[in-house]
Amino acid sequence: MSELLSFALFLASVLIYAWKAGRNTWWFAATLTVLGLFVVLNITLFASDYFTGDGINDAVLYTLTNSLTGAGVSKYILPGIGIVLGLTAVFGALGWILRRRRHHPHHFGYSLLALLLALGSVDASPAFRQITELVKSQSRDGDPDFAAYYKEPSKTIPDPKLNLVYIYGESLERTYFDNEAFPDLTPELGALKNEGLDFSHTQQLPGTDYTIAGMVASQCGIPLFAPFEGNASASVSSFFPQNICLGDILKNSGYQNYFVQGANLRFAGKDVFLKSHGFDHLFGSEELKSVVADPHYRNDWGFYDDTVLDEAWKKFEELSRSGQRFSLFTLTVDTHHPDGFISRTCNRKKYDFDGKPNQSFSAVSCSQENIATFINKIKASPWFKDTVIVVSSDHLAMNNTAWKYLNKQDRNNLFFVIRGDKPQQETLAVKRNTMDNGATVLDILGGDNYLGLGRSSLSGQSMSEIFLNIKEKTLAWKPDIIRLWKFPKEMKEFTIDQQKNMIAFSGSHFRLPLLLRVSDKRVEPLPESEYSAPLRFQLADFAPRDNFVWVDRCYKMAQLWAPELALSTNWCVSQGQLGGQQIVQHVDKTTWKGKTAFKDTVIDMARYKGNVDTLKIVDNDIRYKADSFIFNVAGAPEEVKQFSGISRPESWGRWSNAQLGDEVKIEYKHPLPKKFDLVITAKAYGNNASRPIPVRVGNEEQTLVLGNEVTTTTLHFDNPTDADTLVIVPPEPVSTNEGNILGHSPRKLGIGMVEIKVVEREG
């Protein structure tokens, strides 16, 4: 209803101003600005919906100020360009319409009415309401009743008798199991769901809407609200350190806790969270690659679900035979947005909807088959009678190729329980949320029926039943939940440990690199993660007088304030204000101690603008002074005009990447010498080793042969045509996820370059 009202007010404002207001520059500018704000708000809502599937939620506050990288980002580029072009066209059309009768005399009354209607359209828009509520949640002091509802359970389960298998299905919401809406999509797992305790109304709340947040909510009974962006939690050293979570209780009760997934454990800090709360045995992509049957059988995120669940079954067998009380948690990944992945062993590889194949539905159908196979193995085993199996979605599906069909249904998270000791078949329609999952499991295992804000759905009353406005209530509790981190409010001294790549201050520890915004009563950490912008881009968003401490590789800050460190990959500390003074210190000891030293200086806006502009220079446009191309730092020597076909810098150098160009091309600003030696320090990847690699300058071609280890080769070139471009052609680029950023499409690697140097020969 509010959408229709806001649009009607918008349309009325446009028509009244265009046909009645007449000519007046001030009123035109004011009305266009407010109407433009309406357009921007609604496009923001549309774009947020596209990425999150849930409008402008808590995570969008970070998306607006950080670049979006991660899984399938390339698939979002075209829609993003479309939004920008559409916005430009709408503004142009809006300005043209409003000035249709600019030659008519100005009418104050109609101008005022048009402006008021425009303001009303903004106020009535859902986007404005969502943003207002989010901003309020950032500035509240908390809610006084939080302490009354947040309850810590007993730290142990008296006389535990059951083992626990807990399966998180990535984005595998209960909506997929509606056989009327999606016929025969989930027959195998759906049949198992119907054999157990099926909780049909598990809603998603703020702070529970992405994987690590869903895990925290289900195991600790609280949303993941933190003094930093949730997926950046990989940088912290402990996770809600004061809270009692399900894993803590299990460990205290004699359980050995295991977690198995196909992706890297460091992503979003899952390893930190689990280690902080009772899990001593963690297996991710790095740990599994030496034990799986085919270490090369991977998708963009890690190992496929069939591989992961096979390893989980092996672990279940091993632990069951040992007689040790255990919990085994596992997380699938094949149903990750935007498209999902199809395991090669499942029978259900294709699902058609609306008369055409749908990749997301196909991934769901395949993944549920793999999960069902795993569960049926457990059910057929002699240990099932001592086991509780839990299946839940980590969160609702985000914007995938099935999302528009899901949105037509009443959407809920998946949560069902299969008890080997006491088979129960029932569908429970009680209102509940993800925070109730851990409390329900704890209750079944013989512990308390409450956990944080969660309550057992078998013997307690969910917050979703107590509060009709539970989403708003959850946001009201946000400051109280953030305070549970016990995060420091000041930073005066700090210590950098180079062996551990950590920074410590005021009792808190963070992984490097790290950016901190420091004010009188608040320290805001801004870590670097797969889903956030590089720290220098985040720093560029700081206000001129914001105090910062930035710990990163020296070359990243050298172009601004320490050019002598432009080629250094050591750690450096920079602090100051973008509009004031900045200092850069080289971390030259294994354990390095520093102090904050912010000065109240006069702000220079020209200096501020220069710093911001420099911080925003993209990596490939950075230039440094050197007599060779050093590949383990960003940018290129000043003599290089442009380059292509080269991947990002890594600690040792850079790979060629055929996804960015079939050839490595380095174009210099001036012609290369008439006679020169080309000194190449490099290695080959995979089948490119021991193969002739063409290297061309103008019409002349030499051959380079590399092995899998780094070597230095000198090639002799004559350049009679004054060519200015060096071309290297890897013979057989290999598609691989090795060394890739989690969630990115595979790179096609050919040669790994450490250094290339042009040395002019006499004569």
UniProtKB/Swiss-Prot annotation:
Gene Ontology CC terms: plasma membrane
Pfam families in the cross-refs: DUF7024, Sulfatase
Transmembrane feature ranges: 1-21, 26-46, 77-97, 108-128
Major location category of this protein: membrane
Reaction(s) catalysed (UniProt annotation): a phosphatidylglycerol + a membrane-derived-oligosaccharide D-glucose = a 1,2-diacyl-sn-glycerol + a membrane-derived-oligosaccharide 6-(glycerophospho)-D-glucose
SUPFAM superfamilies listed in its UniProt record: Alkaline phosphatase-like
Protein name as catalogued: Phosphoglycerol transferase I
The organism of origin for this protein: Escherichia coli (strain SMS-3-5 / SECEC)
Gene name of the record: mdoB
